[in-house]
């Protein structure tokens, strides 16, 4: 039979694209489990992803991997079977195709919804490589991985499920106890059948984000924890029978949104570690040239208008996980083995932080993306490209003044700063995407040199520091409070203190004093302090300190005038833009608070604001209040009621119905979305367009 290469997406973003290839399927019998080996004694983990499609046109095979450079290989990707098919038909994705679920013999199988299945049976288990025979139980990439382990007994292999393109069914799987049970049982079956040492869930993303057509629901936050808990239960039970430790890991997003949409502290207690994807912070989806994986925040990026620059960097992403309760030893830092490019970037700043015409029209395999080995061979200080260094963000970049192309990437120098960060924070190691991008082993050699993997595993520190004592206020102004406290102790060592204003983190310091600024004059605040150690353990809170800021010097008690002429200037399905006439004040207006009903929606310094994250076709009522430096707040402006735009549907298109004959190409609407019929059929209950992508394609 003819099969199609199923993977066109790289690990986090749809911007990676691989063309489809026609492949011949090979039928092979089942596989005999290899003997279990002892867990490697590693002081740091070095986890490398190997994508199945590397063995196609990229011609980078498992045999090309140097197993001494990694401790774990994550094989990407397996998928989830649902209604007899897998894949993702979402037209916004890089590969909107589905296939029947198949076994290692490329035979169609009938399995329950939520079962883990091979992503590409031909390349996974069917293709013969040198030394293979036509009738051996398992061939393909998976057999090659097992051969690699036979000669390197400390190497571990992990099957990664999902990825950017194939995360469409995770929410459905996690939603019920029945499907969680199916998924967890199939994980055990998959590991035993193909001799993997663990399973890695790459769900992109719970609650929100990812491809538009992915299943998602608010309950994903709690359901993800339940799913992982069930997998852990099944893996531990299987491990007790098989005499080995089965690993469970996840790939996590690096944004504050991901941390808010998951129960990271609970997840960390379940999994062996978390691979945080600290890359893809900037790319061709925006027109401002910026860095793929900046280690530190660069204020110049914010000044140039780079979106979310203060949080879209490696340090902020990792710290967000630590602050959410992930122990440092369970956090493995992501490193990209590729760069991202833009075209039409002005020469100012050597192309950095410039408004460009768009993403690069060229790349190694996809436009806009450059493998590191390709950059080494053809770009770095070659062919008109000059290497520059951003010493704040700690990353290199290339600029070609002739063609105005800017490329952000990582090299051995920037990787060195990232490994130093790993050590300074006591993190568990490094993960990288992906092995075929570093064919000269330049970056792998750097990781291996900086992160020794042959020592004794230090015991996991789970002891929290003692509670900071005698928290007190030592200074107060109109806009700041200075606090002090007695030092905590720890079995290993205290690394710092988090200071909280109410429930919100106000600042983090390494000493026993802190000044919290930006407060409102004449206002009462309550502060507590928690100590932390290198493993990410937090102490209980100190005694609460309640203190009031002083009145503004000069006795300014006069509030600004109320804003006037509040009006809506634009509406979309999810946002409303407002404008108003400026207020006046005896000293000066410092900003405006915009309220959605009684809730504060945003604070701005100008006289316009856009409120996002709203529901379509819904009415909202807004008011605005002005404020000054003394903390005086005006009366509310006039109220304005505005309705967001409705979701657009195709006029004249009929709603989908049961027991109706449909022809190929016919359009219907279902749950507010438009679908095109792919095959003639008569509809039945359960064949709703959202459930049967083999029959319907979302428009």
UniProtKB/Swiss-Prot annotation:
Residues 1-41 form the signal peptide. It catalyses: Random endo-hydrolysis of N-acetyl-beta-D-glucosaminide (1->4)-beta-linkages in chitin and chitodextrins. PANTHER family: CHITINASE, CHITINASE 12-RELATED. PROSITE patterns: FN3 (PS50853), GH18_1 (PS01095), GH18_2 (PS51910). The active site is at 204 (proton donor). Chitin binds at residues 135-136, 162-165, 205, 277-280, 433. Residues 449-471 are annotated as: Disordered. Residues 467-553, 562-647 form the Fibronectin type-III domain. GO terms for biological process: chitin catabolic process; polysaccharide catabolic process. It comes from Niallia circulans (Bacillus circulans). This is Chitinase A1.
């Amino acid at each position: 039979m003819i099969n199609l290469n199923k993977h066109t997406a790289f690990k986090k973003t749809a911007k990676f694209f691989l063309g489809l290839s026609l492949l011949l399927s090979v039928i092979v019998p089942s596989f005999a489990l290899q003997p279990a080996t002892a867990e490697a004694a590693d002081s740091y983990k070095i986890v490398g992803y190997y994508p199945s499609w590397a063995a196609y046109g990229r011609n980078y095979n498992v045999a090309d991997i140097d197993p001494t450079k990694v401790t774990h290989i994550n094989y990407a990707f397996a998928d989830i079977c649902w209604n007899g098919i897998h894949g993702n038909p979402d037209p916004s994705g890089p590969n909107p195709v589905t296939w029947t679920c198949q076994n290692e013999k490329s035979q169609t199988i009938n399995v329950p919804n939520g079962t883990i299945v091979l992503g590409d049976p031909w390349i996974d288990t069917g293709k013969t490589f040198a030394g293979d025979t036509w009738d051996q139980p398992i061939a393909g990439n998976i057999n090659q991985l097992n051969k690699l382990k036979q000669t390197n007994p400390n190497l571990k292999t992990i099957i990664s499920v999902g990825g950017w393109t194939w995360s469409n069914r995770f929410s459905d799987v996690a939603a019920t106890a029945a499907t969680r049970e199916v998924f967890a049982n199939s994980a055990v079956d998959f590991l035993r059948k193909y001799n993997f040492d663990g399973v890695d869930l790459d769900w992109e993303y719970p609650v929100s984000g990812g491809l538009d057509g992915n299943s998602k629901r608010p309950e994903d936050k709690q359901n993800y924890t339940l799913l992982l808990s069930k997998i852990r239960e099944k893996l531990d039970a299987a491990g007790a029978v098989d005499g080995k430790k089965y690993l469970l890991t996840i790939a996590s997003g690096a944004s504050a949104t991901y941390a808010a949409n998951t129960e990271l502290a609970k997840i960390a207690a379940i999994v062996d570690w978390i691979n945080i994807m600290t890359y893809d912070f900037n790319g061709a989806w925006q027109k401002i040239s910026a860095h793929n994986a900046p280690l530190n925040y660069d204020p110049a990026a914010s000044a140039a208008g780079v979106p979310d620059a203060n949080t879209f960097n490696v340090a902020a992403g990792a710290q967000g996980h630590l602050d959410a309760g992930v122990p440092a030893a369970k956090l493995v830092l992501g490193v990209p083995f590729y760069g991202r490019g833009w075209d039409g970037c002005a020469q100012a700043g050597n192309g950095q932080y410039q408004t460009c015409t768009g993403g690069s029209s060229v790349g190694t395999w996809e436009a806009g993306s450059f493998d590191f080995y390709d950059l080494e061979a053809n770009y770095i200080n070659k062919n008109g490209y000059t290497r520059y260094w951003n010493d704040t963000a700690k990353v290199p970049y290339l600029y070609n003044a002739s063609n105005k192309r800017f490329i952000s990437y990582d090299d051995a120098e920037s990787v060195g700063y990232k490994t130093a960060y790993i050590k300074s924070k006591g993190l568990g190691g490094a993960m990288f995407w992906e092995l075929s991008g570093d064919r000269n082993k330049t970056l792998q050699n750097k990781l291996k040199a900086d992160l020794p993997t042959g020592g004794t595993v230090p015991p996991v520190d789970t002891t929290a520091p003692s509670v900071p004592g005698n928290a007190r206020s030592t200074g107060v102004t109109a806009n700041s409070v200075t606090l002090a406290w007695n030092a905590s102790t720890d079995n290993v060592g205290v690394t710092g203190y988090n200071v909280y204003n109410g429930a919100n983190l106000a600042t983090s310091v390494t000493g026993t004093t802190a000044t919290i600024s930006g407060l409102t004059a004449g206002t009462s605040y309550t502060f507590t302090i928690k100590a932390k150690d290198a493993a990410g353990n937090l102490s209980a809170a100190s005694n609460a300190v309640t203190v009031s800021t002083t009145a503004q010097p000069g006795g300014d008690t006069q509030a600004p005038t109320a804003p006037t002429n509040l009006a809506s200037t634009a509406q979309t399905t999810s946002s409303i833009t407002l404008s108003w006439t400026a207020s006046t004040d005896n000293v000066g207006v410092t900003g405006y608070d915009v309220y959605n009903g009684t809730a504060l929606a945003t604070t701005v310094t100008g006289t316009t604001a856009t409120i996002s994250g709203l529901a379509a076709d819904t009415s909202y009522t807004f008011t605005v209040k002005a404020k000054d430096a003394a903390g005086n707040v005006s009366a509310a402006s006039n109220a304005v009621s505005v309705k967001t735009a409705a979701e657009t549907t195709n006029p004249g298109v009929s709603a989908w119905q049961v027991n109706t004959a449909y022809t190929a190409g016919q359009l219907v609407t279902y749950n507010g979305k438009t679908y095109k019929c792919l095959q003639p059929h008569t509809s039945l209950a359960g064949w709703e367009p959202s459930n049967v992508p083999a029959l319907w394609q979302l428009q």
